[in-house]
Protein backbone atom coordinates (compact mmCIF):
# COMPACT_ATOMS: atom_id res chain seq x y z
CA UNK A 1 0.00 0.00 0.00
CA UNK A 2 1.28 3.42 -0.89
CA UNK A 3 2.03 5.62 2.12
CA UNK A 4 0.53 9.08 1.76
CA UNK A 5 1.68 12.15 3.63
CA UNK A 6 -0.65 13.66 6.21
CA UNK A 7 -3.00 16.07 4.52
CA UNK A 8 -2.10 19.72 4.82
CA UNK A 9 -2.64 22.70 2.61
CA UNK A 10 0.27 23.40 0.26
CA UNK A 11 2.28 26.08 2.04
CA UNK A 12 3.03 28.42 -0.84
CA UNK A 13 -0.39 28.66 -2.42
CA UNK A 14 -2.78 28.04 0.44
CA UNK A 15 -5.08 30.49 2.17
CA UNK A 16 -5.15 29.75 5.88
CA UNK A 17 -8.85 30.63 5.94
CA UNK A 18 -9.70 27.87 3.44
CA UNK A 19 -10.22 24.42 4.96
CA UNK A 20 -8.22 21.58 3.45
CA UNK A 21 -11.41 19.97 2.18
CA UNK A 22 -12.07 23.03 -0.01
CA UNK A 23 -8.57 23.31 -1.47
CA UNK A 24 -8.64 22.79 -5.26
CA UNK A 25 -5.76 20.80 -6.76
CA UNK A 26 -5.18 22.18 -10.25
CA UNK A 27 -3.35 19.64 -12.43
CA UNK A 28 -4.98 20.79 -15.66
CA UNK A 29 -1.99 22.88 -16.69
CA UNK A 30 1.63 21.73 -16.92
CA UNK A 31 3.10 24.35 -14.58
CA UNK A 32 6.49 22.74 -13.75
CA UNK A 33 6.93 23.96 -10.17
CA UNK A 34 8.24 20.52 -9.14
CA UNK A 35 11.79 21.70 -9.85
CA UNK A 36 11.72 24.72 -7.53
CA UNK A 37 13.41 22.86 -4.70
CA UNK A 38 16.35 21.80 -6.88
CA UNK A 39 17.04 25.31 -8.13
CA UNK A 40 16.66 26.73 -4.63
CA UNK A 41 19.48 24.44 -3.50
CA UNK A 42 21.64 25.80 -6.31
CA UNK A 43 21.73 29.13 -4.52
CA UNK A 44 23.35 31.97 -6.49
CA UNK A 45 24.87 29.79 -9.22
CA UNK A 46 22.15 30.89 -11.65
CA UNK A 47 22.03 34.53 -10.62
CA UNK A 48 22.24 37.02 -13.48
CA UNK A 49 22.96 40.73 -12.98
CA UNK A 50 21.47 43.06 -15.59
CA UNK A 51 22.31 46.75 -15.37
CA UNK A 52 19.95 49.48 -16.46
CA UNK A 53 22.04 50.15 -19.57
CA UNK A 54 22.18 46.50 -20.68
CA UNK A 55 20.16 44.78 -23.42
CA UNK A 56 18.41 47.93 -24.61
CA UNK A 57 18.50 47.35 -28.38
CA UNK A 58 16.05 45.25 -30.40
CA UNK A 59 19.04 43.67 -32.13
CA UNK A 60 21.35 40.91 -30.89
CA UNK A 61 23.40 39.77 -33.90
CA UNK A 62 22.64 41.26 -37.31
CA UNK A 63 24.82 38.62 -39.01
CA UNK A 64 22.44 35.90 -37.78
CA UNK A 65 19.27 35.04 -39.71
CA UNK A 66 17.48 35.13 -36.35
CA UNK A 67 18.91 38.54 -35.44
CA UNK A 68 17.15 38.75 -32.06
CA UNK A 69 18.79 35.51 -30.80
CA UNK A 70 21.41 36.28 -28.14
CA UNK A 71 24.73 34.62 -29.11
CA UNK A 72 25.27 33.23 -25.61
CA UNK A 73 21.89 31.48 -25.74
CA UNK A 74 22.68 30.01 -29.15
CA UNK A 75 25.93 28.59 -27.78
CA UNK A 76 24.23 27.23 -24.65
CA UNK A 77 21.56 25.48 -26.74
CA UNK A 78 24.15 23.82 -28.98
CA UNK A 79 26.28 22.79 -26.01
CA UNK A 80 23.38 21.22 -24.10
CA UNK A 81 22.13 19.22 -27.08
CA UNK A 82 25.70 18.09 -27.61
CA UNK A 83 26.02 16.84 -24.03
CA UNK A 84 22.61 15.12 -23.94
CA UNK A 85 22.77 13.80 -27.50
CA UNK A 86 19.05 14.23 -28.17
CA UNK A 87 19.12 16.41 -31.30
CA UNK A 88 21.43 17.41 -34.14
CA UNK A 89 22.30 21.11 -34.27
CA UNK A 90 24.84 21.12 -37.11
CA UNK A 91 23.85 22.84 -40.36
CA UNK A 92 20.67 24.20 -38.81
CA UNK A 93 19.20 27.58 -38.09
CA UNK A 94 18.22 28.22 -34.49
CA UNK A 95 15.08 30.32 -34.12
CA UNK A 96 14.26 31.53 -30.62
CA UNK A 97 10.66 32.15 -29.62
CA UNK A 98 8.44 33.14 -26.72
CA UNK A 99 8.00 29.53 -25.70
CA UNK A 100 7.50 26.66 -28.12
CA UNK A 101 3.85 27.70 -28.54
CA UNK A 102 4.87 30.77 -30.56
CA UNK A 103 7.37 28.67 -32.49
CA UNK A 104 4.76 26.08 -33.42
CA UNK A 105 2.53 28.84 -34.74
CA UNK A 106 5.49 30.34 -36.61
CA UNK A 107 6.36 26.97 -38.16
CA UNK A 108 2.77 26.29 -39.27
CA UNK A 109 2.62 29.79 -40.77
CA UNK A 110 5.99 29.36 -42.52
CA UNK A 111 5.17 25.99 -44.06
CA UNK A 112 1.70 27.14 -45.14
CA UNK A 113 3.01 30.33 -46.74
CA UNK A 114 5.44 28.28 -48.84
CA UNK A 115 2.81 25.74 -49.97
CA UNK A 116 1.55 25.69 -53.56
CA UNK A 117 -2.09 25.78 -52.48
CA UNK A 118 -4.05 26.80 -49.41
CA UNK A 119 -5.52 26.20 -46.92
CA UNK A 120 -2.99 23.61 -45.79
CA UNK A 121 -4.41 20.81 -43.64
CA UNK A 122 -2.96 20.49 -40.12
CA UNK A 123 -3.30 17.18 -38.27
CA UNK A 124 -1.99 15.34 -35.21
CA UNK A 125 -2.55 11.76 -34.08
CA UNK A 126 -4.98 11.42 -31.17
CA UNK A 127 -4.61 11.73 -28.32
CA UNK A 128 -2.90 15.00 -29.18
CA UNK A 129 -1.77 18.13 -27.35
CA UNK A 130 -5.02 20.06 -26.93
CA UNK A 131 -3.37 23.43 -27.53
CA UNK A 132 -2.66 22.45 -31.15
CA UNK A 133 -6.36 22.92 -31.85
CA UNK A 134 -6.34 26.41 -30.34
CA UNK A 135 -3.10 27.38 -32.06
CA UNK A 136 -4.44 26.50 -35.51
CA UNK A 137 -8.00 27.83 -35.14
CA UNK A 138 -7.79 30.92 -32.94
CA UNK A 139 -6.76 33.44 -35.62
CA UNK A 140 -9.01 31.86 -38.28
CA UNK A 141 -6.24 31.95 -40.85
CA UNK A 142 -7.08 31.22 -44.46
CA UNK A 143 -3.60 29.75 -44.95
CA UNK A 144 -4.15 26.58 -42.93
CA UNK A 145 -6.99 24.59 -41.40
CA UNK A 146 -7.15 22.18 -38.47
CA UNK A 147 -8.29 18.79 -39.79
CA UNK A 148 -8.10 16.86 -36.52
CA UNK A 149 -6.92 13.30 -35.96
CA UNK A 150 -4.08 12.16 -38.23
CA UNK A 151 -5.09 8.50 -37.87
CA UNK A 152 -8.04 8.95 -40.21
CA UNK A 153 -6.64 11.69 -42.43
CA UNK A 154 -6.74 10.88 -46.17
CA UNK A 155 -7.38 14.27 -47.75
CA UNK A 156 -5.40 15.11 -50.87
CA UNK A 157 -3.21 18.20 -51.07
CA UNK A 158 -0.61 19.81 -48.80
CA UNK A 159 -0.68 18.99 -45.11
CA UNK A 160 1.34 19.49 -41.93
CA UNK A 161 1.54 16.72 -39.34
CA UNK A 162 2.37 17.71 -35.76
CA UNK A 163 4.31 14.93 -34.03
CA UNK A 164 4.95 15.20 -30.29
CA UNK A 165 7.39 12.66 -28.87
CA UNK A 166 7.19 11.70 -26.08
CA UNK A 167 3.55 12.49 -26.66
CA UNK A 168 1.56 14.99 -24.67
CA UNK A 169 -0.80 13.75 -23.17
CA UNK A 170 -0.10 9.98 -23.05
CA UNK A 171 3.71 9.83 -22.93
CA UNK A 172 4.14 7.41 -25.84
CA UNK A 173 6.99 7.63 -28.34
CA UNK A 174 5.57 8.88 -31.64
CA UNK A 175 6.49 8.81 -35.31
CA UNK A 176 4.56 10.21 -38.27
CA UNK A 177 1.19 8.57 -38.93
CA UNK A 178 0.10 9.90 -42.34
CA UNK A 179 3.39 8.90 -44.05
CA UNK A 180 3.47 10.11 -47.65
CA UNK A 181 7.24 9.95 -48.26
CA UNK A 182 6.99 10.71 -51.97
CA UNK A 183 4.71 13.71 -51.49
CA UNK A 184 6.71 16.94 -51.51
CA UNK A 185 3.69 18.74 -50.05
CA UNK A 186 3.82 16.57 -46.90
CA UNK A 187 5.44 18.49 -44.03
CA UNK A 188 6.14 17.51 -40.43
CA UNK A 189 6.83 19.53 -37.30
CA UNK A 190 8.44 17.50 -34.51
CA UNK A 191 7.76 18.74 -30.98
CA UNK A 192 10.41 17.35 -28.63
CA UNK A 193 9.45 19.32 -25.51
CA UNK A 194 9.79 16.19 -23.36
CA UNK A 195 12.64 14.42 -25.13
CA UNK A 196 15.05 14.82 -22.22
CA UNK A 197 16.63 12.12 -20.03
CA UNK A 198 14.64 12.82 -16.85
CA UNK A 199 11.43 11.93 -18.73
CA UNK A 200 12.40 9.32 -21.29
CA UNK A 201 15.36 7.27 -22.55
CA UNK A 202 17.40 9.14 -25.16
CA UNK A 203 17.49 6.43 -27.81
CA UNK A 204 18.87 8.44 -30.70
CA UNK A 205 20.00 11.85 -31.85
CA UNK A 206 16.92 13.27 -33.54
CA UNK A 207 17.47 14.67 -37.03
CA UNK A 208 14.35 16.24 -38.59
CA UNK A 209 13.49 19.29 -40.67
CA UNK A 210 11.82 21.24 -37.85
CA UNK A 211 12.36 20.34 -34.19
CA UNK A 212 10.83 22.33 -31.33
CA UNK A 213 12.11 22.54 -27.75
CA UNK A 214 11.01 24.52 -24.72
CA UNK A 215 13.00 25.77 -21.73
CA UNK A 216 10.03 25.37 -19.38
CA UNK A 217 9.79 21.59 -19.53
CA UNK A 218 13.53 20.98 -19.31
CA UNK A 219 14.31 22.93 -16.16
CA UNK A 220 10.90 24.10 -14.94
CA UNK A 221 11.44 27.79 -15.78
CA UNK A 222 8.10 28.29 -17.51
CA UNK A 223 7.93 31.95 -16.54
CA UNK A 224 10.91 32.83 -18.72
CA UNK A 225 8.86 31.95 -21.84
CA UNK A 226 11.73 30.70 -23.97
CA UNK A 227 11.69 28.04 -26.66
CA UNK A 228 13.77 27.29 -29.73
CA UNK A 229 13.44 25.60 -33.08
CA UNK A 230 16.16 23.72 -34.95
CA UNK A 231 15.37 24.27 -38.64
CA UNK A 232 17.11 22.78 -41.68
CA UNK A 233 15.62 24.86 -44.48
CA UNK A 234 16.72 28.50 -44.70
CA UNK A 235 13.48 29.73 -46.29
CA UNK A 236 11.38 28.09 -43.58
CA UNK A 237 13.60 29.62 -40.90
CA UNK A 238 13.29 33.06 -42.55
CA UNK A 239 9.51 32.79 -42.61
CA UNK A 240 9.46 31.78 -38.95
CA UNK A 241 11.62 34.76 -38.03
CA UNK A 242 9.33 37.06 -40.03
CA UNK A 243 6.32 35.71 -38.12
CA UNK A 244 7.95 36.37 -34.75
CA UNK A 245 8.98 39.89 -35.83
CA UNK A 246 5.38 40.74 -36.74
CA UNK A 247 4.00 38.95 -33.68
CA UNK A 248 6.32 40.27 -30.96
CA UNK A 249 9.30 42.06 -32.59
CA UNK A 250 11.72 39.49 -31.24
CA UNK A 251 12.05 37.78 -27.87
CA UNK A 252 12.91 39.20 -24.44
CA UNK A 253 16.68 39.56 -24.08
CA UNK A 254 16.48 39.37 -20.29
CA UNK A 255 14.80 35.97 -20.58
CA UNK A 256 17.37 34.81 -23.12
CA UNK A 257 20.31 35.79 -20.92
CA UNK A 258 18.78 34.07 -17.90
CA UNK A 259 18.04 30.96 -19.95
CA UNK A 260 21.61 30.84 -21.24
CA UNK A 261 22.97 31.07 -17.70
CA UNK A 262 20.73 28.29 -16.38
CA UNK A 263 21.38 26.00 -19.35
CA UNK A 264 25.11 26.42 -18.82
CA UNK A 265 24.77 25.58 -15.13
CA UNK A 266 22.63 22.56 -16.05
CA UNK A 267 25.32 21.41 -18.49
CA UNK A 268 27.95 21.64 -15.76
CA UNK A 269 25.83 19.55 -13.37
CA UNK A 270 25.83 16.75 -15.95
CA UNK A 271 29.45 16.07 -14.95
CA UNK A 272 28.44 15.25 -11.38
CA UNK A 273 27.72 11.73 -10.13
CA UNK A 274 25.65 13.12 -7.27
CA UNK A 275 21.91 12.62 -7.62
CA UNK A 276 21.23 15.85 -5.75
CA UNK A 277 23.67 17.82 -7.95
CA UNK A 278 23.14 16.31 -11.42
CA UNK A 279 19.90 17.85 -12.66
CA UNK A 280 18.86 15.01 -14.95
CA UNK A 281 19.55 12.40 -12.25
CA UNK A 282 17.61 14.48 -9.74
CA UNK A 283 14.71 14.96 -12.13
CA UNK A 284 14.58 11.29 -13.14
CA UNK A 285 14.55 10.11 -9.52
CA UNK A 286 11.80 12.60 -8.65
CA UNK A 287 9.68 11.53 -11.62
CA UNK A 288 10.28 7.85 -10.87
CA UNK A 289 9.17 8.35 -7.28
CA UNK A 290 5.98 10.13 -8.35
CA UNK A 291 5.08 7.55 -10.97
CA UNK A 292 5.63 4.70 -8.52
CA UNK A 293 3.31 6.35 -6.00
CA UNK A 294 0.65 7.00 -8.64
CA UNK A 295 0.85 3.46 -10.01
CA UNK A 296 0.46 2.07 -6.50
CA UNK A 297 -2.72 4.08 -5.96
CA UNK A 298 -4.08 2.94 -9.33
CA UNK A 299 -3.08 -0.67 -8.61
CA UNK A 300 -4.98 -0.66 -5.34
CA UNK A 301 -8.04 0.58 -7.19
CA UNK A 302 -10.10 -1.35 -9.70
CA UNK A 303 -11.40 1.88 -11.18
CA UNK A 304 -8.45 3.53 -12.94
CA UNK A 305 -5.96 2.75 -15.70
CA UNK A 306 -2.53 4.07 -16.74
CA UNK A 307 -0.43 3.36 -19.84
CA UNK A 308 2.57 1.05 -19.60
CA UNK A 309 5.86 2.14 -21.14
CA UNK A 310 8.51 -0.28 -22.43
CA UNK A 311 12.10 0.03 -21.30
CA UNK A 312 14.63 1.31 -23.82
CA UNK A 313 18.37 1.85 -23.81
CA UNK A 314 19.22 5.44 -22.91
CA UNK A 315 22.37 6.71 -24.60
CA UNK A 316 22.71 9.50 -22.05
CA UNK A 317 22.63 7.30 -18.93
CA UNK A 318 24.15 4.28 -20.68
CA UNK A 319 21.55 1.74 -19.56
CA UNK A 320 17.98 0.56 -20.14
CA UNK A 321 15.39 2.76 -18.45
CA UNK A 322 11.66 3.30 -18.20
CA UNK A 323 9.82 6.44 -19.20
CA UNK A 324 8.39 8.77 -16.57
CA UNK A 325 6.29 11.25 -18.58
CA UNK A 326 5.48 14.77 -17.46
CA UNK A 327 1.76 13.96 -17.70
CA UNK A 328 -0.28 10.96 -16.63
CA UNK A 329 -2.92 9.75 -19.08
CA UNK A 330 -5.37 8.57 -16.45
CA UNK A 331 -8.32 6.46 -17.53
CA UNK A 332 -11.31 4.79 -15.96
CA UNK A 333 -12.71 1.34 -16.71
CA UNK A 334 -16.27 2.57 -16.36
CA UNK A 335 -18.19 4.76 -18.79
CA UNK A 336 -17.48 7.75 -16.61
CA UNK A 337 -16.96 11.43 -17.31
CA UNK A 338 -13.64 11.35 -15.50
CA UNK A 339 -12.86 15.08 -15.66
CA UNK A 340 -16.21 15.79 -13.95
CA UNK A 341 -15.67 13.05 -11.38
CA UNK A 342 -12.25 14.43 -10.47
CA UNK A 343 -13.66 17.94 -10.33
CA UNK A 344 -16.24 16.68 -7.86
CA UNK A 345 -13.28 15.73 -5.66
CA UNK A 346 -11.70 19.16 -6.23
CA UNK A 347 -9.05 17.96 -8.68
CA UNK A 348 -8.75 19.85 -11.97
CA UNK A 349 -7.51 17.90 -15.01
CA UNK A 350 -7.47 18.19 -18.81
CA UNK A 351 -10.45 16.42 -20.42
CA UNK A 352 -9.57 13.62 -22.82
CA UNK A 353 -12.11 14.96 -25.31
CA UNK A 354 -10.00 18.11 -25.67
CA UNK A 355 -7.14 15.84 -26.77
CA UNK A 356 -9.19 14.07 -29.44
CA UNK A 357 -9.96 11.14 -27.13
CA UNK A 358 -12.96 10.30 -24.92
CA UNK A 359 -14.48 11.31 -21.60
CA UNK A 360 -13.03 8.22 -19.90
CA UNK A 361 -9.54 9.76 -20.02
CA UNK A 362 -7.91 12.85 -18.56
CA UNK A 363 -4.46 14.40 -18.64
CA UNK A 364 -2.96 15.01 -15.20
CA UNK A 365 0.21 17.02 -14.66
CA UNK A 366 3.01 15.22 -12.80
CA UNK A 367 4.98 18.46 -12.37
CA UNK A 368 3.24 20.21 -9.48
CA UNK A 369 4.88 20.96 -6.15
CA UNK A 370 5.35 17.89 -3.96
CA UNK A 371 2.69 18.84 -1.41
CA UNK A 372 0.11 19.44 -4.15
CA UNK A 373 0.95 16.09 -5.75
CA UNK A 374 0.49 14.31 -2.42
CA UNK A 375 -2.95 15.85 -1.95
CA UNK A 376 -3.88 14.61 -5.44
CA UNK A 377 -2.77 11.07 -4.58
CA UNK A 378 -4.81 11.08 -1.40
CA UNK A 379 -7.94 12.27 -3.18
CA UNK A 380 -7.49 9.72 -5.94
CA UNK A 381 -7.13 6.99 -3.31
CA UNK A 382 -10.29 8.22 -1.60
CA UNK A 383 -12.16 8.05 -4.89
CA UNK A 384 -11.13 4.40 -5.01
CA UNK A 385 -12.45 3.86 -1.48
CA UNK A 386 -15.77 5.49 -2.38
CA UNK A 387 -15.96 3.19 -5.40
CA UNK A 388 -15.38 0.14 -3.20
CA UNK A 389 -18.06 1.18 -0.72
CA UNK A 390 -20.56 1.71 -3.54
CA UNK A 391 -19.91 -1.82 -4.77
From Swiss-Prot:
It comes from the Eukaryota. Its cofactor is pyridoxal 5'-phosphate. Pyridoxal 5'-phosphate binds at residues 58, 100-101, 168, 191-194, 214-217, 225. Changing residue 171 to E: In tir2-1; loss of activity. Its EC number is 2.6.1.27, 2.6.1.99. It holds the Pfam family Alliinase_C. Inhibited by L-kynurenine. It catalyses: L-tryptophan + 2-oxoglutarate = indole-3-pyruvate + L-glutamate; L-tryptophan + pyruvate = indole-3-pyruvate + L-alanine. Changing residue 217 to A: Loss of activity. One of its GO terms (molecular function) is L-phenylalanine-pyruvate transaminase activity. Induction: Up-regulated by trans-zeatin, ethylene and high temperature. Down-regulated by auxin and shade treatment. Pathway: Plant hormone metabolism; auxin biosynthesis. Keywords: Aminotransferase, Auxin biosynthesis, Cytoplasm, Pyridoxal phosphate, Transferase. PANTHER family: BIFUNCTIONAL ASPARTATE AMINOTRANSFERASE AND GLUTAMATE/ASPARTATE-PREPHENATE AMINOTRANSFERASE-RELATED, L-TRYPTOPHAN--PYRUVATE AMINOTRANSFERASE 1. This is L-tryptophan--pyruvate aminotransferase 1. It comes from Arabidopsis thaliana (Mouse-ear cress).
Amino acid sequence: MVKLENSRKPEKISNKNIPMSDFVVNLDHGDPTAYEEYWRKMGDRCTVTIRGCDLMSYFSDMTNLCWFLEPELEDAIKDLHGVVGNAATEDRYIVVGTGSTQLCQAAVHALSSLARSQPVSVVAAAPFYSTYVEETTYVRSGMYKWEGDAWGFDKKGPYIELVTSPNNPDGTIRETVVNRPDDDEAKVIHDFAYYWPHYTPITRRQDHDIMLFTFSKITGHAGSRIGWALVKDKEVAKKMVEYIIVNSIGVSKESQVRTAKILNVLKETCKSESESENFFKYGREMMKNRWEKLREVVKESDAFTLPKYPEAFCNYFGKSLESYPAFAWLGTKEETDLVSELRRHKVMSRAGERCGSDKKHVRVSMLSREDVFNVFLERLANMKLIKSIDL
